[in-house]
Amino acid sequence: MNRFRTSWDRRKFLLAAGLASTVGSLRPGNVYGAYLANRHGESYRALGVRPLINAAGTYTTLTGSVMAPEVRDAMAEASRYFVPLIDLQLAVGERIAKMIGVEAAMVSCGAASSITLATAACITQGDPDKVRRIPDTTGMKNEVIMVKSHRMGFDHAARAAGGKIIEVETPEELEKAINEKTAMLFFVHVFEGRGKVNRNHFIAAGKRHNVPVFNDAAAELPPATSLSAIVGEGFDLVGFSGGKGMRGPQASGLLIGRKELIAAAHKNNNPHSDTIGRGMKVGKEEIMGLLKAVEIYHKRDHDHDQVQWRGFMERIAAMVSDVPSIDTEVYIPGPGGHPLPYLRVKWDERKVGLTYAECFKQLQDGEPRIDVNNKNTGLELASYNLFPGEERIVGMRMREILLAAAKRA
């Protein structure tokens, strides 16, 4: 884990960042009021749903990420016309594959959909009779091998296509588990390092036995290189979310890999009626929106993003630095984590008179609502979904909550 322990001359930092007057004199109500006046989300509030500042991450439960303006424009433009959907899917898949340097690609309605379609492709190999029959996979190759420590709720998406999960814990067990019923090896990228079986074991075993290997890389952007590098390692299919790091439509995903497997996935997908993917509809708006998102992401200045995100975390750390017993750490996770700056904030709960859970709840209950991660050993903040200026609101609100508790303690 690459860590930067925060060491601050608080006044000097706040002056340089333009925050000294904000922390020293402005009342929180004025700051929050100005924020809400500029970004209030009235259409949501009319429904009783409060928009939030997202310092937690690209979770689907918090609606992933906010689309780039160019993506919204592309979707609006797409909405004005009728097109043959199959032709559009094939054309956009071909364009994306060429852009990122992979054999083939297709737009799905999300990373979980990519899991289902990848599994269906590997089980059916595009055979029309099998396509119509699944999830009834009686008599077919239907076993999907996973590392036991990689099991998760999302493997339901493989089972939905009729896949039977076979668990292994060692390279030896992986080798023994592969047989004439094995349809796919299923690796979860974020769980690399869990257990004794790594990605190289999976890739090598798949090659030896001619079994397709799928990598669920839903949230593995950034880094941008993941778009081609994971397939380049030897995986036959890789699935990404379109509505997380790429800032594409929330109801979109990307499945990339071998040409014949992507073709088989298409046969299992919308708009074909008698398929497992018919209910996973991705419309022309999402397809064109994701194409634009990939174009933007491919050309983006990712180094600038990293500098900006680290600045967000450092500013929040500076703003809570005078809380008794506070300990802040800006860090980038190691293997298995997302390579972007996070902030961990810890304090002595007895000295401050406030538990992490209580602070977490007050952040959510306040106005504006702020979401962070409560890790029980401290609060963790993610930089990716913050807009410039929001870090000041987060820092002021955390400081307000913590100092108020410390005064009462």
Residue ranges and their predicted role:
Residues S25-N30:
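C-terminal segment of classical bacterial N-terminal signal peptides
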Residues L14-A17, V23, Y35-I53, G57-L62, ...:
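Conserved PLP-enzyme active-site core in the AAT-like
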Residues L85-L90, A104-A105, G277-K281, R300-W309, ...:
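Flexible, glycine/charged-enriched surface loops at secondary-structure junctions
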Residues M319-I401:
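Conserved C-terminal alpha-helix-loop-beta "cap" of PLP-dependent enzymes
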Residues M1-A20:
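N-terminal secretory signal peptides and thylakoid transit peptides that target proteins
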Residues A68-A111, A121:
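Conserved N-terminal alpha-helix of the aminotransferase class I/II PLP-enzyme fold
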Residues P51-T61, R72-S79, Y342:
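Generic N-terminal amphipathic, Lys/Arg-enriched alpha-helix
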Residues V294-A318:
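Structural signature of PLP-dependent enzymes
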